[in-house]
Regions:
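Beta-rich extracellular carbohydrate-active architectures
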Residues: 1, 16, 20-22, 26, ...
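Short "repeat-start/strand-capping" segments in structured domains, especially the N-termini
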Residues: 12-15, 34-36, 46, 77-78, ...
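Extracellular beta-strand/beta-solenoid scaffold signature
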Residues: 2-8, 23-45, 58-74, 88-102, ...
Length: 187
């Protein structure tokens, strides 16, 4: 297990394709600002595409911030995840969290993606171990702190996660279409 994030994207108009992020000491891949003086959503990373990537087996010492993919806290507009897979992470498969201190982020689109077995570790022999009580363990977490953000989840599947397959996390603006969520263990 490494230390920190595998990949932290703070730019604009980037494409990340056919990459794998695994066994990191925090989350696998995150889109968020890199410079603290960027305080407006218009300055935050925007217009990025993450295509056909996989993130798995990410774990952090605090047991609450090891998402597979994250586009949260300080991310701008038009960030898209397409054809990606997130599984066996300590925390959420996808985390699109927003908090009051920084304000609403730009809407995130997640399409044709799968999230499964988050909350469980994938061992070298292909068996699984329960990570314990991680913070999320959801397939797709699409908001936070009752802030309206028009995140859009479409044509995705979520199954076998330790908690919810899809969690709006108090986001009143979240939308989804053609999403299948089954055999998740619940809240």
């Amino acid at each position: 297990m490494g230390n920190g994030k595998a990949f932290y994207l703070g730019g604009h108009y980037d494409e990340v394709k056919n990459c794998t992020f695994h066994d990191n000491g925090e989350l696998g891949f995150q889109i968020s600002r890199l410079i603290a003086t960027e305080v407006s959503v218009s300055e935050w990373p925007s217009n990025n595409l993450v295509l056909n990537c996989e993130s798995y087996n990410n774990n952090d010492p605090s047991k609450n911030n090891a998402d597979g993919f994250a586009c949260k806290l300080t991310a701008g507009y038009n960030n898209v995840f397409s054809g990606c897979s997130s599984h066996h992470n300590l925390d959420d498969g996808w985390d699109c969290y927003t908090k009051l201190a920084t304000g609403a982020i730009g809407p995130v689109q997640v399409e044709n993606c799968v999230a499964y077995r988050n909350g469980y570790q994938l061992n070298d022999d292909a068996s699984e171990t329960d990570w314990g009580n991680g913070a999320g363990c959801n397939g797709f977490k699409m908001g936070g702190e009752n802030i309206h953000v028009a995140h859009y989840l479409k044509d995705c599947i979520s199954w076998g996660n330790k908690r919810s397959g899809v969690d709006s996390n108090y986001n009143p603006g979240f939308k989804m279409r053609n999403v299948i969520s089954y055999n998740n263990e619940g809240p």
